[in-house]
Design a protein with these regions (language model features):
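PAPS-dependent sulfotransferase catalytic core
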Residues: 98-142
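PAPS-dependent sulfotransferase catalytic domain
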Residues: 1-102, 106-116
Length: 152
């Protein structure tokens, strides 16, 4: 095993955009601004996500990186966590490894101090953003969404 094992987990930019915006708003309401607190509206959040997508593009050409879709982790946690354990060359039967895997299992991590996990619902942007906003997102990220494996 090399000393550095890189795992890159990405999420549908539309859901990531909504999540970042809401996370920033909650932090401001609590009087503790964070890295997302400047996302005060749809346009600022959209500009922020453009950088997110460009970063995703750069990771696609890197070698020896495990790239995982967030949604795949939620929908098939067993397979994706096994893939991660294999990539990291860990013994998945060891209690300390199982403890970490089980601690991050969807539904288990909610509300844990220090974890950036609030709702984690797939496709929630469709419920929150207007049809016009969804159209802007489709126009803006359409090609990238397809490359990332998402439906427009």
């Amino acid at each position: 095993m090399s000393l550095l094992q890189i795992t890159y987990i990405y999420r549908d930019p539309r859901d990531a955009m909504l999540s970042a915006y809401e996370y920033g708003r909650r932090a401001l309401e609590k009087g503790r601004p964070n890295a997302f607190s400047h996302l005060s509206d749809f346009e600022k959040s959209l500009a922020f996500m453009e950088d997110y997508v460009r970063i995703w593009e750069k990771w696609q050409v890197e070698k020896n990186v495990l790239i995982v879709r967030y949604e795949d982790l939620l929908q098939d946690y067993e397979a994706e966590s096994a893939r991660l354990v294999g990539f990291l060359e860990l013994d998945g039967s060891k209690p300390e490894v199982r403890e970490v895997i089980d601690g991050y299992r969807p539904g288990q991590a909610e509300g844990q101090q220090g974890l950036h996990f609030y709702k984690g619902k797939i496709g929630r942007f469709r419920e929150v953003y207007s049809a016009e906003q969804q159209s802007v997102l489709a126009d803006h990220f359409g090609t990238d969404l397809e490359k990332m494996g998402y439906e427009i």
